[in-house]
C-alpha cells in the first residue's frame, strides 16, 4: 500500500526542518559568542565588582620556588596531574597533618611529613583539600620565585626568632602574640590551617574578617589620609581605593611589639608597608596580590600572588582570646618542669 504526502504535510515538514537547522545554527552562534565574551564579575549597587563572600586559601603552592624546580616557574599539565596523584597516594585521612608549604615539599621528596612532630594528635582528616596550580611559587617578584636577601637587621631578627623557638617562656610577654591570641598576622601564608576570610563591602568601606583570632580589618575607601605615625596598631592603618576593577589596600603604622606578618617564613616589623590588591577573576576565584615593602628587614620589596577560592562553607568561630586558659596552663607546666629538673 502506498501512502501519499499532501502538499500541506510536505510544507510542514520543510518548516520543521528549517526551524531545527535555525536552532542549531543559533545555538552555535550563541556558543561562539559565549566563548569569546570575557567573564564579568557580579557588581554591587554602586557598580563596583562584588568581592563579598567567604574565601579560603588552601593552595598547595609554596611561597618560594623549591630548589628542585629552580628553572621551572610553571608545571606542565602532565606534571601538575602527577603532583595531584602523588598527593592522593601519599596523604590519606589518617596521615599526620601537614600545613603550609610542608605538603608540596613532602611531595617533591616523595615521603610523608608531619606538621606537628608526628604526635598523632592531628590528622589530615581534619584539614581541607589542597588545590594545586601550575605555578611553582607564590612569589612572582623577584622573578626567581625566591625571597630577596634580608638586611643585617633582618638577619639579626631571624636568628633571634630561631633562638627563642621552642624555648619555655618565662612570662606571657615572652610568648608570641599568636599564642597570646592577640593577633595572628597577615597576609596569612599558612595555608589549610583556618585560612578563611569573609569580605563585606559597602560603597564607603570594605571589611575583611579573618578566621584566625577573628580579627576584622575595617578599610575606609573615602580617600582619608593615614593616621599619625605615632599611633601604631597590630592590624596597622589601612586605606583602600579602586583602580578599575581592582581593590587596592595600603597598610602602614604597624605595632612594634610583634611580627605583623606572623613570622611564617617571613620577616616584618613596624616599618612594613603592605600593598594588597584584590581582583575577582572568576566566579569562584579571587586573585590576591600583595607587595611587602619593609626596608629594615628586606633589601628590596617583593610580591606574591595567591588565588583564593570561594568557600562552600561558612566562617566558623575561632575561640581564642588573650587570657585564654591554655596560656596559663602552658606557663605553669613550664615552671613545673623547671622545678622538677632542679
Q: Predicted regions span which residues?
A:
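PEST-like low-complexity, intrinsically disordered acidic/proline/serine-rich tracts
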Residues: 2-342
Amino acid at each position: 500500500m502506498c501512502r501519499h504526502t499532501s502538499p500541506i504535510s510536505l510544507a510542514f515538514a520543510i518548516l520543521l526542518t528549517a526551524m531545527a537547522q535555525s536552532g542549531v545554527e543559533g545555538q552555535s552562534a550563541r556558543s561562539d559568542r559565549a566563548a569569546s565574551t570575557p567573564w564579568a564579575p557580579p557588581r554591587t549597587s554602586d557598580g563596583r565588582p562584588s568581592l563579598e563572600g567567604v574565601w579560603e586559601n588552601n593552595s598547595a603552592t609554596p611561597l618560594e620556588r623549591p630548589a628542585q624546580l629552580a628553572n621551572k616557574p610553571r608545571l606542565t599539565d602532565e606534571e601538575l596531574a602527577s603532583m595531584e596523584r602523588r598527593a592522593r597516594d601519599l596523604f590519606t585521612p589518617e596521615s599526620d597533618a601537614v600545613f603550609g608549604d610542608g605538603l608540596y615539599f613532602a611531595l617533591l621528596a616523595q615521603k610523608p611529613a608531619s606538621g606537628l612532630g608526628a604526635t598523632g594528635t592531628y590528622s589530615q582528616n581534619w584539614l581541607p583539600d589542597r588545590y594545586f596550580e601550575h605555578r611553582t611559587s607564590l612569589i612572582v617578584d623577584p622573578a626567581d620565585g625566591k625571597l630577596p636577601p634580608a638586611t643585617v637587621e633582618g638577619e639579626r631578627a631571624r636568628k633571634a626568632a630561631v633562638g627563642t623557638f621552642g624555648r619555655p617562656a618565662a612570662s606571657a610577654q615572652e610568648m608570641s602574640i599568636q599564642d597570646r591570641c592577640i593577633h595572628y598576622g597577615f597576609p596569612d601564608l599558612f595555608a589549610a590551617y583556618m585560612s578563611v576570610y569573609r569580605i563585606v563591602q559597602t560603597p564607603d568601606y570594605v571589611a575583611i574578617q579573618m578566621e584566625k583570632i577573628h580579627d576584622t580589618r575595617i578599610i575606609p575607601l573615602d580617600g582619608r589620609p593615614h593616621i599619625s605615625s605615632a599611633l601604631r596598631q597590630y592590624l596597622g592603618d589601612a586605606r583602600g581605593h579602586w583602580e578599575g576593577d581592582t581593590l587596592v589596600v595600603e597598610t602602614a603604622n604597624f605595632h612594634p611589639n610583634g611580627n605583623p606578618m606572623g613570622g611564617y617564613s617571613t620577616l616584618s616589623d613596624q616599618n612594613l608597608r603592605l600593598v594588597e590588591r584584590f581582583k575577582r577573576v572568576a566566579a569562584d576565584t579571587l586573585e590576591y596580590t600583595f607587595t611587602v615593602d619593609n626596608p629594615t628587614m628586606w633589601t628590596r620589596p617583593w610580591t606574591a600572588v595567591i588565588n583564593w577560592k570561594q568557600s562552600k562553607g561558612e566562617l566558623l568561630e575561632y575561640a581564642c582570646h588573650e587570657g585564654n586558659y591554655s596560656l596559663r596552663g602552658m606557663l605553669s607546666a613550664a615552671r613545673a618542669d623547671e622545678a622538677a629538673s632542679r
